[in-house]
Curated annotation (Swiss-Prot):
Gene name as annotated: boca
Amino acid composition bias (Acidic residues), ranges on this chain: 48-61
Keyword flag Cell inner membrane: no
Name of the molecule in the record: LDLR chaperone boca
Family affiliation: Belongs to the MESD family.
Source domain of life: Eukaryota
Leader sequence segment: 1-18
Function: Chaperone specifically assisting the folding of beta-propeller/EGF modules within the family of low-density lipoprotein receptors (LDLRs). Acts as a modulator of the Wg pathway, since some LDLRs are coreceptors for the canonical Wnt pathway.
Source organism per UniProt: Drosophila melanogaster
Major subcellular site: endoplasmic reticulum
Subunit relationships: Monomer. Interacts with Arrow and Yolkless.
Amino acid sequence: MQTRLVLLLLALTPLVLAKKFKEEEKPAWAKKDIRDYSEADLERLLDQWEEDEEPLEDDELPEHLRPQPKLDLSNLDSKSPEDLLKVSKKGRTLMTFVSVTGNPTREESDTITKLWQTSLWNNHIQAERYMVDDNRAIFLFKDGTQAWDAKDFLIEQERCKGVTIENKEYPGVNAKKDEL
């Protein structure tokens, strides 16, 4: 019986000693009801929560907090700004717009772009596809350099009207020119 009591006391001791503040020593913001917390209070609470955590590895950080990869400009052709753009997007998420020719229904465009997406996957180019209009889709690439390889494939397709990367339009080979 005494050993149980001693074990119980030993188990409860860390819980009692682990309390960070005594009631009278708490800061004013910590005495508030949680429903009355301001953004600054919540930010302070988050900082306390994360103060003892180890920093995340570079690949675990959100994309906007990751360090920029070093660009090797010695291998680039200075006459091609496209190559510079391609290298600068390595490891970064990039969205491209892809348009389908003609006046297709949403289902028809969905089928065509799904076929293109599967062809890209078969070529080891990872792209997510989102339909944004009846004849337009967004292809999202986790590695931005793959977007230019995908562009080369897509503009060769029979029903591709054009691909837009970084506000630059690349017309499809089989797309008819719009006459003014």
